[in-house]
Each structure stands twice: as C-alpha cells, then as structure tokens.
From Swiss-Prot:
Pfam families attached to this UniProt entry: Dimerisation, Methyltransf_2
Protein name in the entry: Indole glucosinolate O-methyltransferase 2
Keywords: Methyltransferase, S-adenosyl-L-methionine, Transferase
Superkingdom of the source species: Eukaryota
Organism: Arabidopsis thaliana (Mouse-ear cress)
Enzyme Commission number(s) of this protein: 2.1.1.-
Induction: By the green peach aphid Myzus persicae.
EC category: transferase
GO molecular function: methyltransferase activity; O-methyltransferase activity; protein dimerization activity
Residues holding S-adenosyl-L-homocysteine: G217, D240, D260, M261, K274
Purpose: Involved in indole glucosinolate biosynthesis. Catalyzes methoxylation reactions of the glucosinolate indole ring. Converts the hydroxy intermediates 4-hydroxy-indol-3-yl-methylglucosinolate (4OH-I3M) and 1-hydroxy-indol-3-yl-methylglucosinolate (1OH-I3M) to 4-methoxy-indol-3-yl-methylglucosinolate (4MO-I3M) and 1-methoxy-indol-3-yl-methylglucosinolate (1MO-I3M), respectively.
Pathway annotation: Secondary metabolite biosynthesis
Amino acid sequence: MGYLFEETLSSNPKTPIVVDDDNELGLMAVRLANAAAFPMVLKASLELGVFDTLYAEASRTDSFLSPSEIASKLPTTPRNPGAPVLLDRMLRLLASYSMVKCEKVSVGKGERVYRAEPICRFFLKNNIQDIGSLASQVIVNFDSVFLNTWAQLKDVVLEGGDAFGRAHGGMKLFDYMGTDERFSKLFNQTGFTIAVVKKALEVYQGFKGVNVLVDVGGGVGNTLGVVTSKYPNIKGINFDLTCALAQAPSYPGVEHVAGDMFVDVPTGDAMILKRILHDWTDEDCVKILKNCWKSLPENGKVVVIELVTPDEAENGDINANIAFDMDMLMFTQCSGGKERSRAEFEALAAASCFTHCKFVCQAYHCWIIEFCK
C-alpha cells in the first residue's frame, strides 16, 4: 500500500543550535570530510533501481512507499531480510539532499516513507529516450576504471604524467576502451547529452537549411537521431571509430560511417562536435577542427556543444561548481583533456582558420557555439 499525505509532517523536533561563525564552519568542514557517502549511496540506489521504482509509483498514485514496499518492487528482489532497514538508511540520506521526500507515518510502527522528488526524473534508467539520463554518468564515474585514476592525482601533481595512464598501464582512455568491452559499453551509454540537445533545439535554429549534417565522434548516434527527428530533411552522418559504432542502433535518415577524426572527416554542410573537444589538448583540438574545416563548404559551420568555464571561481555558483567538477574529471580521465573558457574557444577557432566563434545559447550546463568558416 502507498501512503498519501495532505500536509507535511515534521520528522525532527526543533533542536536549538548555537549559531556562530566557528560552529557554522565546523559543520561545513564535517560535511566535506564525509562527502564520499552521498555519491556512493546515489550510485547504489541507481544500480538497485530505487529512483525508477519511486518515480513510477509517484507518477501513478502520487503516494509514498515504505522501505519494505520499495524493496518488494525493485527489479531484483533482495534476498537479504534486512534490506528494508538498509534502504531506509540510504533513503534518508538522499532525502537530506532533496532527492526524495521523507515523511513519518503517524500510526503503527511510525516508520518513514518516501516519494520521488522532481529531480529524480533526471536519474531514471528507463528515461534515456525522453530527456536523457544521468544515471549512467554516475555509474561510470564511480566505476573502478575511473576510481583508480583518482588515486594517481597526488603523484601527477608532484611528478607529472597522465592519471589514467598511470592507473592503466600507460594506456589512454579511448585506447583502453578498445580492450574492455564492459567498460566501453557502459561509457557509451551515458545519455544526458540527449537532454542537452533537446533543450537546445527548443531555441537553437542553426540546423534549418542544412542538408547533410556530420556528427564527428557521434558515438552511438543518438544526437543525430534527435536532430533528424525534428529536421527529417537532414541526412545525418554519424562518424566515429569502429568500436563505438558497434553498439549503434539504426535511426531514420542517419548513416553510420567508421573512421578517425584525426585523419579526415566526411563532407557535410555542417558538423557537430558534442563534448569532444574537452577530451583533447589544444593541439589535438586544432587537428580535429582543421579536418572539419577542410570538409565544410564556404559558409559552413561546426556546431560545438561544450561547457564554458567561468573566468572566476565564484563561491556558491552552481555553474562554477559543475564546470570545475567536470574539469577535474577531464584531468583524471583524459590525458590533456580540460574544460575551456570563452577566450580559449575563441583561440581554438582562430587557430583552426574559422572566421569567427559565436556563443549562441545555453542548454543546462552546455553552450551551443558556432565555429563559422
């Protein structure tokens, strides 16, 4: 049975807290020192299917579920009789981060019950074709392949080198994926860029009049699938390495073409570079962009979809948090990879012979940037 509440019930008595600067700083310090708990609980909850279970129930009945009810509805039924107690402990942490809503039943055992909050829709495993999902992004970020690279961070600062290579026998990320089918599949399932593209298409008009659109490093082709569904006149060419295309489904109007963007790029009226440039050094980016430039007609353009770092690290700025978090992910995952500022993108455009660089619009954490020939 689900639980419906007309009013919010207070789950905690009001406890007087001495408010002073030292106390507040101490609380912040303790929270930071224990920050590892939240992402690991988030990952386990995603793997268990907790958010999908809660969101499905909230969509149907808008009701709360007890930990026992959640356990019984998970995709894999727990064999552990203590699972509801453990789920309750995990869920109350998630509730403290406003990912789920917690209430306490005033009858019976007085147990806590939970309901999905709206933010959960961004973490649904089965929501990739709707808005995209961050679930796979969380899971891949905390996979052992990437976790092992973080252990190298101190030594890279002191001695130099490449964090990913130090952790994986000198191999770079994309070479490694050719040797690890499990991780490659997991990496290519990261699907939130679909949400970015869909959000951008609400306002971005730059694909109107395009006949042939090449997605350079397009992975499994889902970006072109979204674009061509809105612009069915466009012929899409999804261009990537053979290993990436091996898992690509078919999309109407989209052709999958294998190749290496460092060698050449298929011709098209326009091109997409979606979260590609942040994987590479400036020198490598210029090589990729020059190959794009060669394959474009006069007045052609590359539509770059990337995060743009702020010039200053503003305290409490969510965009700065995201930008610098992701920059450190690039630091540890990709040799020479980094997030870039507006000035750095303008410099890349100039070094690659493009006449100008236009920052058109923002979708979630990414900007749509046009490099115009």
